[in-house]
Amino acid sequence: MEDDKLIVRIISKEGEIIRLTEEGERFLSSCLSSLKDAILSLHSIEIKGNIVSGLGEGKIFLSMEYYKSQINKIMGFDPFPGTLNIVIYDKASLENRLLLDSSPSLMVPEYKQKDRVLGAVKLYPAAINKLTPAAVVIPLRTTHPKSVIEIISPFHLREKLNLKDGDEVTIEVYV
């Protein structure tokens, strides 16, 4: 740092004093600003994929009062009873999907009923083809591979966006 003229070292009988130079103060201020932006800013991750038909399990779960009420409480909308399944087809989008696993999420907690356990679900606010509100739903217990994501919205997304199997969509996930 001394070679970069960011600090000045003063040696005396009492010891050593290290002071920031004006250039050092500017550099430190720039670092703090970058850290603040990184911590406080809303960032998004883009994921592209193609629409695929699901097995209808999303409809079953989103028809359950527990999930409906939790999603409304957390996301602020009543979800359409069904998810839109998207298969990720390119490397960059799959890498971005994997980033979600280590990104902070909103969470529907696990709920124990008498005869079953309703599993926890991660929620990420999102836009699909620029349409909001929407959310990426990642159940903690799922049969889907990482290359398939599910989207929820208050809208019937296939109708609202005129989508059919094979159509490409862009998901902007806010993390």
From Swiss-Prot:
FMN binds at residues 142, 150. InterPro entries: RibK_CTP-dep (IPR039063), Riboflavin_kinase_archaeal (IPR023470), Riboflavin_kinase_CTP-dep (IPR023602), Riboflavin_kinase_dom_sf (IPR023465). Its EC number is 2.7.1.161. CDP binds at residues 54-59, 155-158. Binds 1 Mg(2+) ion per subunit. Its cofactor is Mg(2+). Catalyzes the CTP-dependent phosphorylation of riboflavin (vitamin B2) to form flavin mononucleotide (FMN). Pathway: Cofactor biosynthesis; FMN biosynthesis; FMN from riboflavin (CTP route): step 1/1. It comes from Saccharolobus solfataricus (strain ATCC 35092 / DSM 1617 / JCM 11322 / P2). The keyword tRNA processing does not apply. This is Riboflavin kinase. GO terms for molecular function: magnesium ion binding; nucleotide binding; riboflavin kinase activity. It catalyses: riboflavin + CTP = CDP + FMN + H(+). Mg(2+) binds at residues 83, 85. GO terms for biological process: FMN biosynthetic process; riboflavin biosynthetic process. The keyword Metal-binding applies. It holds the Pfam family CTP-dep_RFKase. Belongs to the archaeal riboflavin kinase family. Keywords: Flavoprotein, FMN, Kinase, Magnesium, Metal-binding, Nucleotide-binding, Transferase.
